[in-house]
UniProtKB/Swiss-Prot annotation:
It catalyses: (2R)-2,3-dihydroxy-3-methylbutanoate + NADP(+) = (2S)-2-acetolactate + NADPH + H(+); (2R,3R)-2,3-dihydroxy-3-methylpentanoate + NADP(+) = (S)-2-ethyl-2-hydroxy-3-oxobutanoate + NADPH + H(+). This is Ketol-acid reductoisomerase (NADP(+)). Involved in the biosynthesis of branched-chain amino acids (BCAA). Catalyzes an alkyl-migration followed by a ketol-acid reduction of (S)-2-acetolactate (S2AL) to yield (R)-2,3-dihydroxy-isovalerate. In the isomerase reaction, S2AL is rearranged via a Mg-dependent methyl migration to produce 3-hydroxy-3-methyl-2-ketobutyrate (HMKB). In the reductase reaction, this 2-ketoacid undergoes a metal-dependent reduction by NADPH to yield (R)-2,3-dihydroxy-isovalerate. Residues 1-181 form the KARI N-terminal Rossmann domain. Its cofactor is Mg(2+). Substrate binds at S251.
Length: 329
């Protein structure tokens, strides 16, 4: 894998360019402010009237419509949520995609699944910081950077990689390292990680553990501490030094239980389901379902959200978190 650093990127390639950030949300505010602090001219495309419009003004920008920003820019980074990107692209961006411009994304969903099909005469790239926007901004202001992924989908100008690397340098990515990937790889692995491990897998594991203890007669408050609250302690150790750091830091009792009981939770059947989840991502089944869900009004999605919000673990957790002064800061 090729990894790029500061010395591999030329920020001067953006000296006479204007970058449009479409969507001033979690990633948008970080990209915009970091680029500006790197000396790049930035315009903000944001829906008027909302909190992000006001936040952009508070941060010293003069926000405008997405169409106005796209018209004014040479590089256009689309950072609105996945389900809104196609509509924003077709209505506000496409009419202003002149030959030689660059279209940028921080996630490959809409390009990989062909919800957005740019004209052949523009560059299309991805620069994806591997951290939330507030971290991307904070680390940049501290003189470092969050590592990024970079991918090229179209190289109409012959300089797409150089331009994308300049953008990555502007947001601070080359300070930490910019790793090469493809739109396909980033999209499929990102979706799999979210569904099987980080969100779907972890949430269901936490709920199942909580329910198992409660059904066995243990107090819900104790079950919450053991199955949800303490998860952060373990994940932080893994985040800082991998599984080995976590196992070094826990008790021998916990480590032994890890080895003998973990494989009984993640069984061969679990692994088979994980492979099936990956297959449905790869063949487009998940993407089609998600796209159709949004097109049909999101009734099923909203129902699942409501049902999960009413799970007993949420009520117990709200009460216990109210006792934790450090969470109120």
């Amino acid at each position: 894998m090729k990894i790029y650093y500061d010395q591999d990127a030329d920020l001067s390639l953006l000296a006479d360019k204007t970058v449009a950030i479409i969507g001033y949300g979690s990633q948008g505010h970080a990209h915009a402010q970091n680029l500006r602090d790197s000396g790049v001219k930035v315009v903000i495309g944001q829906r008027p009237g909302g909190p992000n419009w006001e936040l952009a003004k508070e941060n010293g920008f003069t926000p405008m419509s997405a169409a106005e920003a796209a018209a004014a820019a040479d590089l256009i980074m689309i950072l609105v949520p996945d389900q809104h990107q196609k509509a924003v692209y077709e209505k506000d961006v496409l009419p202003h995609l002149k030959p030689g411009k660059m279209l940028l994304f921080a996630h490959g969903f809409n390009i990989h699944f062909q919800q957005i099909v740019p004209p052949a005469d523009v560059d299309v790239a991805m620069v994806a910081p591997k951290g939330p926007g507030h971290l991307v901004r904070r680390v940049y202001t501290e003189g470092a950077g969050v590592p990024c992924l970079i991918a090229i989908h179209q190289n109409a100008t012959g300089k797409a990689m150089e331009t994308a690397l300049a953008y990555a340098k502007g947001v601070g990515g080359t300070r930490g390292g910019v790793l090469t990937t493809t739109f396909k790889e980033e999209t499929e692995t990102d979706l799999f990680g979210e569904q099987a491990v980080l969100c779907g897998g972890a949430a269901e594991l936490v709920k199942a553990g909580f329910e198992t203890l409660c059904e066995a007669g243990y107090q819900p408050e104790i079950a919450y501490f053991e199955c949800l609250h303490e998860l952060k302690l373990i994940v932080d150790l893994m985040y800082e030094g991998g599984l080995s750091r976590m196992r070094y830091s826990i008790s021998d009792t916990a480590e032994y239980g890890d080895y003998v009981s973990g494989p009984r939770v993640v069984t061969d059947e679990t692994r088979a389901e994980m492979r099936q989840i990956l297959k449905e991502i790869q063949d487009g089944t998940f993407a089609r379902d998600f796209i159709m869900e949004n097109m049909s009004g999101r009734a099923h999605f909203l129902s699942m959200r409501r049902i999960n919000a009413e799970h007993p673990i949420e009520k117990v957790g709200a009460k216990l978190r109210g006792m934790m002064s450090w969470l109120k800061k």
